[in-house]
């Protein structure tokens, strides 16, 4: 995996602005891993994809994952800060697309981005979950008669086999003390960083081009430290 330059980040933000969140994740990985095909990345198990997104975040933006969510009980802000490198290293074992999970006498492969994209076509969560399950089923039996508890049980079995497929953290509300589990959507997390960095870069290009008459390529070729120093001098 290669790191992404300032020009890469601007290009990503521009190309991915109107894409579905799943496609944004694959676009970012394609930029960082040009040797991998887009189709191949779409068929990676979700944990493998999220691990790569974590590695990319650490490479470009550093290991700190900071955010917040509102308490469902009282609305108080619950902040969190994680070390992405520690999280990635804790799940450094290989996840194979061929891995099979057995549940209720049936076998299932691990879900991929392509499976989630198919599920996203459906109007409600349960129908989407059933569509993903059917795509992942490797046997001949159907799961049409499964109830919500069966789907939840399979979801737990798949999560145990691929822990990074759904990244969840435990939080405690500082206001009411309510404990909850929240999901970190790694693609959305990474894309928010890409968008913030891109907008800052656009401002720096605009400011320095006006002040010094430099071309965009010249400005982006500067190191971040030098570019920030020039931008600060322009504002002074």
Predicted regions located by residue number:
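Long C-terminal interaction/binding lobes of large macromolecular proteins
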Residues: 1-236
């Amino acid at each position: 995996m290669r790191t992404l330059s300032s020009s890469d980040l601007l290009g990503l933000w521009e190309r991915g602005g109107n894409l579905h969140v799943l496609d944004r994740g694959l676009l970012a990985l394609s930029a960082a891993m040009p040797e991998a095909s887009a189709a191949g990345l779409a068929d990676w198990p979700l944990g493998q994809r999220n691990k790569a997104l974590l590695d990319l975040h650490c490479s470009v933006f550093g290991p700190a994952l900071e955010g917040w969510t509102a308490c469902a009980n009282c609305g108080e802000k619950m902040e969190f800060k994680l070390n992405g490198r520690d999280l990635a290293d804790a799940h450094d074992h290989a996840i194979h697309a061929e891995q099979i999970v057995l549940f209720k006498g049936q076998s299932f492969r691990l879900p991929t981005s392509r499976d989630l994209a198919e599920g996203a076509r459906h109007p409600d969560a349960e129908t989407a979950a059933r569509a993903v399950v059917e795509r992942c089923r490797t046997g001949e039996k159907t799961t049409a008669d499964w109830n919500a508890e069966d789907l939840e049980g399979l979801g737990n079995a798949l999560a145990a086999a691929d822990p990074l497929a759904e990244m969840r953290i435990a939080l405690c509300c500082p206001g009411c003390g309510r404990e909850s589990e929240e999901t970190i959507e790694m693609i959305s997390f990474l894309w928010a960083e890409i968008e913030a960095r891109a907008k800052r870069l656009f401002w720096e290009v605009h400011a320095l081009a006006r002040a010094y008459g430099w071309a965009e390529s010249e400005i982006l070729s500067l190191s971040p430290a030098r570019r920030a120093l020039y931008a600060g001098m322009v504002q002074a």
